[in-house]
Regions:
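N-terminal alpha-helical targeting/anchoring segments
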Residues: 1-134, 149, 153
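TRNA-recognition modules of translation machinery and tRNA-sensing kinases, especially anticodon-binding
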Residues: 27, 130-429
Length: 429
């Protein structure tokens, strides 16, 4: 959510930003906000003036009564009563206008960074850099579930009976590999100075609307029936929510947290659920990282965050690349975002395994996450988030890039301590 003062002073700039995000249907919101905001402020000003007059008249009543001027005092009382009725009307008007302004403001996208490429969708995302040499072996790479089945490592049929499409059972060495990756990612981030956190796996609606747009909320979140609770789609939401309604001392920033959590997503929309596999599913596990920092430091932290993911994947011998997300591919609260993609030898192309985002003060403004400077000045913090690793997708990249012709899978050195010292996984059939 952008600063309403900025919108008042720069309506054309805000409209141009909406156009750059190819959301022209939202253009009328800018004029509506300006109109309603003016009405809200006018109602407030009139109410403030009336209160001042009411207070002045109220003081006269006591004096008139002492002077025995009861009739004049009663006349003043009647005038004060009229003010009270009008004040109630004005307060209700101000509240109604302000609530609609807030709703409209939450629909207006954040101002994108000038460096963001302009384009309507992810087909216009721009490659930034490649890390590691993509390799295509001279033997056929099976589909990832077929590789897992060689180790008796996945059961989609049983999961379908228990929970429906979009769920899975991981078994044996594949399940152990899944846990090993999470444990390694946790220690990797702790070694980089992040504080490990196990957050709530459910959040209230005020946190949901504070961290994401309504469109994202509708497409992702599962609501608990009869409760003001949602299952998290990613732990960044509950980690950022930790700072709701806080004033943080400037010298204590930045806060850098990393967390493990299960994640639950409806995956409603264009992509939907994958029929057979673990690429796009309703439930998965993820190691996440977030930063709450001073505004002038958010660009620096943005580069550090995505580099963490690149370094993690490269340490497991997986080639990756980074893509700059174009304007139309950015969620409404994001100022700038890049995807980290891993190489798929089977498909001979890269696929998304993580996303890094700078949200500037959008989440902080909604959640009232403020910073108190050394001089006592208060301002909104900046928030960022990034995927460390999401094992279901990472397992696809891992198995394909470490598969041998005989069906065995090499275990990179960094994971061996988490796999009981194993250097290789041998298929059962």
């Amino acid at each position: 959510m952008i600063d309403i003062k900025f919108l008042r002073e720069n309506p054309d700039v805000v409209k141009e930003n909406i156009k750059k995000k190819f959301q022209d249907k939202k253009l009328p919101l800018v004029d509506e906000v300006i109109e309603l905001d003016a009405k809200s402020r006018a109602a407030k000003q009139e109410a403030d003036d009336l209160r001042a007059k009411r207070n002045q008249l109220s003081k006269q009543i006591g004096g008139l009564m002492k002077e025995g001027k009861k009739q004049e005092a009663e006349a003043v009382k009647a005038q004060v009563a009229e003010f009270a009725e009008r004040l109630t009307e004005l307060e209700e008007q101000e509240k109604t206008y302000a609530e609609q302004v807030t709703k409209d403001m939450m629909m207006i996208p954040n101002m994108i960074d000038p460096s963001v490429p302009i384009g309507p969708d992810d087909s216009c995302n721009v490659e930034i850099e490649k890390f590691g040499e993509p390799v295509v072996p001279d033997f056929e790479i099976p589909y990832h579930t077929d590789i897992m089945n060689r180790f008796d490592g996945i059961d989609l049929d049983a999961a379908g009976k228990v929970a429906g499409n979009g769920f899975y059972y991981l078994m044996g060495d594949i399940a152990r590999l899944h846990s090993a990756v999470i444990s390694y990612a946790r220690d990797f981030m702790i070694d980089r100075g992040f504080t490990y956190c196990v957050p709530p796996f459910m959040i209230r609606s005020n946190v949901v609307t504070g961290v994401m747009s309504f469109e994202e909320m509708d497409a992702m979140m599962y609501k608990i029936e009869g409760e003001d609770l949602y299952l998290i789609g990613t732990s960044e939401h509950s980690m950022i929510g930790k700072f709701i309604d806080t004033i943080n001392e400037e010298e204590k920033l930045p806060y850098t947290l990393t967390s493990y959590s299960p994640c639950f997503r409806k995956e409603k929309g264009a992509h939907g659920i994958e029929e057979r596999g673990v690429y796009r599913i309703h439930q998965f596990e993820k190691q996440e990282m977030i930063v709450v920092c001073k505004p002038e430091e958010s660009k620096m932290w943005y580069d550090k965050l995505w580099q963490n993911t690149v370094d993690l994947f490269r340490s497991m011998d997986i080639p990756v690349r980074t893509l700059e997300c174009c304007s139309g591919d950015l969620a409404d609260l994001k100022v700038k975002s890049c995807d980290v993609e891993a190489w798929s030898p089977r498909q001979k192309k890269y696929f998304e395994v993580g996303s890094c985002s700078n949200l500037s003060d959008a989440q902080a403004r909604r959640l009232k996450i403020r910073v108190k400077g050394a001089d006592g000045t208060k301002y909104f913090a900046h928030t960022l988030n990034n995927t460390v690793v999401a094992p279901p997708r990472m397992l696809i990249a891992f198995l394909e890039n470490n598969l041998n012709e005989d069906g065995s899978v090499n275990i990179p050195t960094v994971l061996q301590p988490y796999m009981g010292g194993k250097t290789k996984l041998t298929p059962k059939h």
